[in-house]
Amino acid sequence: MKRMFLVLLLAFRAFAGDENEITPENVVALMNAYRAEASLPPLHIDRSLTIAASARMQEMADGEWWGHEAPDGTPPFAYIPIEYDYAFAAENLAAGFDTAPLLVQSWMESPGHRSNIMGVQYADCGIAVLEGSTKGPAMGKSVVVLFGRRRVQTVSTK
């Protein structure tokens, strides 16, 4: 299994640039390498979820707070645009990381974060990256990942 993971990481290197840099492309490539090891379909970066993750990161930076719930109680999923119409959604947050592999590995070592990455109910993700912290100057980068799956639209046969 570990050999397959290494091969997948090397294969993604050509597409993602410096694989250590924390970028949305590198983060999703690393998450997808873990999903592939478990024979799960890959996550796809979705424009609507990316906009939502970016808006969420910006609001945290503007308000100098960090967490899954805003100080006013707003949940992370309130940022997802109505046109995404999600059936399932989740969020991973991280701060203070310098490399994408270490960031994703730390999520994989956390049961809740791992569950989001490996969740069969998720097909899409949106990723926002901020240099530093939303609470002021800090080392490393802060990352928001919103996971989702759109509702299945039923077509009337009448």
Regions found by a protein language model. Give the residues of each.
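Sec-dependent N-terminal signal peptides
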Residues: 4-12
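Boundary at the C-terminal end of the N-terminal hydrophobic targeting segment
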Residues: 14-16
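A short alpha-helix/helix-coil micro-patch that ends at or immediately precedes a cysteine
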Residues: 19-62
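Surface-exposed patches in mature extracellular/periplasmic domains of secreted proteins
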Residues: 37-51, 64-73, 114-129
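Short, surface-exposed glycine/acidic/tryptophan-bearing loops
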Residues: 51-98, 117
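Disulfide-stabilized extracellular recognition modules
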Residues: 94-158
